Curated annotation (Swiss-Prot):
<feature type="disulfide bond">
    <location>
        <begin position="6"/>
        <end position="127"/>
    </location>
</feature>
<comment type="similarity">
    <text>Belongs to the glycosyl hydrolase 22 family.</text>
</comment>
<keyword id="KW-1015">Disulfide bond</keyword>
<feature type="disulfide bond">
    <location>
        <begin position="76"/>
        <end position="94"/>
    </location>
</feature>
<dbReference type="GO" id="GO:0046872">
    <property type="term" value="F:metal ion binding"/>
</dbReference>
<feature type="active site">
    <location>
        <position position="53"/>
    </location>
</feature>
<dbReference type="GO" id="GO:0003796">
    <property type="term" value="F:lysozyme activity"/>
</dbReference>
<keyword id="KW-0494">Milk protein</keyword>
<keyword id="KW-0479">Metal-binding</keyword>
<keyword id="KW-0326">Glycosidase</keyword>
<dbReference type="GO" id="GO:0042742">
    <property type="term" value="P:defense response to bacterium"/>
</dbReference>
<dbReference type="GO" id="GO:0031640">
    <property type="term" value="P:killing of cells of another organism"/>
</dbReference>
<feature type="disulfide bond">
    <location>
        <begin position="65"/>
        <end position="80"/>
    </location>
</feature>
<keyword id="KW-0929">Antimicrobial</keyword>
<feature type="binding site">
    <location>
        <position position="91"/>
    </location>
    <ligand>
        <name>Ca(2+)</name>
    </ligand>
</feature>
<dbReference type="InterPro" id="IPR023346">
    <property type="entry name" value="Lysozyme-like_dom_sf"/>
</dbReference>
<dbReference type="InterPro" id="IPR000974">
    <property type="entry name" value="Glyco_hydro_22_lys"/>
</dbReference>
Amino acid sequence: KVFSKCELAHKLKAQEMDGFGGYSLANWVCMAEYESNFNTRAFNGKNANGSYDYGLFQLNSKWWCKDNKRSSSNACNIMCSKLLDDNIDDDISCAKRVVRDPKGMSAWKAWVKHCKDKDLSEYLASCNL
């Protein structure tokens, strides 16, 4: 599934992501835009360390999910393939786990590059939140 920006914003708001970990809803949606283009089936790799990135939030197989290609910390306790379906509830749960680590949203390189310290005040202005 490819979400629209506003569709994803409403979904994430319903899952209490606005303010989660100290990050505004706009930060979460911005991160998803630049990580996956809002596509739940986004799959990328092979990364330099042999890992792959899965789904809407491009969650990494070395740290967050298990893909049977290599050993994993599997901190979200989930098979990576589950992060490629249209149900994003488990993706959201895993993203919440990621942001609890000291790096916070800086775990996502695309967020650092495109969203961090940017003025996102108008980013969701059209979404009727």
